A protein has these predicted regions:
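Short, non-helical or kinked segments that cap or interrupt transmembrane helices
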Residues: 29-40, 102-115, 142-151
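Alpha-helical transmembrane segments in multi-pass membrane proteins
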Residues: 2, 6, 10, 15, ...
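Cytosolic, membrane-interface loops and tails of multi-pass inner-membrane proteins
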Residues: 20-51, 107, 197-215
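Canonical bilayer-spanning transmembrane alpha-helix
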Residues: 135-165, 169-170, 174-175, 187
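Interfacial segments of multi-pass membrane proteins
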Residues: 44-49, 70-74, 110-140, 153-162
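Helix-coil boundary and interhelical linker segments in multi-pass alpha-helical membrane proteins
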Residues: 1-5, 67-87, 119-126, 160-179
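C-terminal ends of transmembrane helices
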Residues: 19-24, 96-106, 132-141, 193-197
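C-terminal membrane-associated helical module and adjoining short loops/tails
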Residues: 168-171, 175-215
Length: 215
């Protein structure tokens, strides 16, 4: 039951679509432009760096909020499996972001919300993923490649830290934690399936922080 409640809490938080709201401020639907989703990269490309930064922050914070709420609700009674419950909240939030019922299930791809998840779940993993992301970004400028690579790193580190006993759970719950993280990782790759095809074909769009670097 606790898992379902965490999923619902996360899903409700995930329904707050920062990019979509910014689009409405500009009197347009962000999903009608660029990649057709309501995420950070599309906001950056469609409305500029400021809008992209606001979208990143908003989508990141909603996942942090979902995890904070779950920790407040279950921090005392379910402390033994709290890391697992926080991942269920994150899963719900990313599902709400990617497939919002309020927007006919047309949301984003979940990367910014996943940043919030990693920050709130394990800051050490966040630091490693951030280094991996930016090292690859300044080399390739492919946001999709960087995001998926960072996700893969996060998944591997969860496996490593879980095996080391960092999360303080028994084996059954630790394996369940791995499964939830695997679902999150698989969903990220699925949502980026078109990007993956373009990467293989060499047609994926690059993102530059400065117009001076564009070719």
């Amino acid at each position: 039951m606790e898992r379902i409640i965490c999923l619902v809490i996360g899903y409700v938080c995930g329904l707050f679509q920062t990019g979509y709201i910014i689009g409405k401020v500009h009197k347009t639907d962000i999903r009608d432009y660029g990649s057709g989703n309501a995420g950070t990269t599309n906001a950056f490309r469609t409305f500029g760096k400021k809008a992209g930064a606001i979208t990143l922050l908003g989508d990141c914070l909603k996942c942090v909020l979902a995890i904070v709420i779950v920790r407040m609700v279950y921090g005392n009674s379910m402390n033994g499996i709290l890391p697992l419950l926080t991942l269920y909240a994150a899963l719900g939030c990313i599902l709400g972001h990617n497939f919002p019922i309020s927007m006919e299930f047309r949301g984003g791809k979940g990367i910014a919300a996943s940043v919030g998840m990693i920050i709130a779940f394990d800051w050490q993993i966040f630091i490693v993923c951030a280094v991996a992301f930016f090292a690859l970004f300044f080399t390739t400028h492919y946001v999709s490649l960087c995001s998926l690579s960072a996700y893969a790193v996060a998944f591997i580190l969860v496996l490593v830290f879980g095996h080391m006993g960092k999360y303080g759970m028994d084996q059954a719950h630790t394996v369940e934690l791995y499964i939830v993280m695997a679902v999150l990782t698989a969903m990220a790759f699925y949502r980026h399936r078109a990007n993956i095809v373009r990467l293989f074909h060499g047609t994926e769009n690059k993102v530059f922080l400065s117009s001076k670097n564009k070719k």
